[in-house]
Regions:
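Accessory interaction regions appended to the cores of large information-processing enzymes
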Residues: 1-324
Length: 324
């Protein structure tokens, strides 16, 4: 930029360097069966105009329309940076959907593929430090510093940006909510080994209906739920997580079959565990390549890109993921 200074005694200031974008997501017009229920700005043209306006005013983001015109790619400095824009837009009344964040790679002078790395710091009670170190190791991180106090330990790591995605939730889990985790961009370095994504399969709604307590009571025995009684669900929407790696299509609206004879347990209310809720950041970190986050002024939902189970199966067969 320009420097304004005294012409008689000019002082030249060093230019301010802006960290390069490290992650990108694609914004698309919502294709949800519930589109238009919460927001009044749902069109693809309106979404494009809003993001192009953001490009004019926000120099820290790189915003480009995809060649096939199916969406707008927005690149920023991490998931928090991107989620701030999404939060602003949902408050303005926009409804849209975004895909899984992808890491932006670079090529070094010798042709080596480079990826963004981050410096991460975790502060946690001493008894959880071992679990934190193990969690970072599984995510491709390396511990570079450690300070142990009487009750708290501060751990410093170097970790690829790919490994950071989803790490905040895991750190909170292993520290029982007592860990403090923050990270910042460090450098571009050679790509390390491939990292695995989410290991748990999803429960996927088979129809567009409101969730029923009886059905949820049965499903919570098979995993954790993302919805509660009365919540609107639709075919292809993620409604829970199961401990096994494969997905399972479920009926969230199944009701109890009533017989002629009264059972001694017929009137016992279903005891449900409160559903697991997600922030925008957590949802973006959670989804896989074949999933999307639906963003509205009132809701954050996760869904399959292909809503129909039949379409998902056809796609899997075409790509050799399952046998015919």
């Amino acid at each position: 930029g320009d420097v304004y200074t005294d012409p008689d005694s000019p002082v030249e200031l060093e230019p301010i360097e802006i960290d390069p974008p490290t992650l990108a997501v694609v914004f698309e017009a919502s294709t949800s069966p519930l589109v238009g229920r919460d927001g009044d700005i749902v069109g693809g043209r309106q979404l494009k105009e809003r993001l192009m306006q953001e490009r004019e005013n926000n120099v820290t983001m790189r915003i480009e329309e995809l060649e096939d015109k199916t969406g707008i790619e927005v690149a920023g400095r991490g998931i928090l940076h991107l989620s701030v824009l999404m939060e602003e837009m949902r408050r303005e009344g926009y409804e849209f959907q975004v895909g899984r964040p992808r890491v932006l790679y670079q090529k070094g002078p010798d042709g080596v593929r480079l990826e963004p790395w981050e410096q991460a710091v975790v502060e946690c009670p001493n008894e959880y430090s071992g679990k934190v170190i193990e969690t970072f190791g599984n995510a491709g991180g390396t511990m570079v510093g450690m300070e142990a106090g009487q009750t708290q330990t501060q751990l410093e790591f170097s970790i690829p940006t790919r490994g950071v995605m989803g790490l905040k939730t895991r750190i909170l889990n292993v520290t029982h909510g007592e860990g403090v985790f923050y990270h910042t961009f460090s450098e571009y370095a050679p790509v390390t080994a491939e990292l695995s994504g989410r290991k748990n399969g999803a429960m996927i709604s088979m129809s567009t209906e409101k969730a029923v307590a009886y059905a949820l009571g049965t499903l919570q025995e098979r995993g954790s739920l993302f919805v509660g009684p009365g919540d609107e669900c639709y075919e292809g929407m993620l409604v829970g997580e199961r401990p096994r790696p494969d997905d399972m299509v479920v009926n969230v609206a199944r009701t109890k079959q009533l017989g002629n004879q009264r059972s001694s347990t017929a009137d016992i209310a279903v005891q449900l565990t409160p559903p697991r809720t997600f922030t925008l950041e957590e949802a973006l970190e959670y989804i896989m390549d074949d999933e999307l986050v639906e963003v509205t002024p009132k809701h954050i939902r996760m869904r399959k890109r292909l809503l129909s189970e039949t379409e998902r199966r056809k796609w899997a067969v075409r790509h050799g993921l399952v046998k015919k």
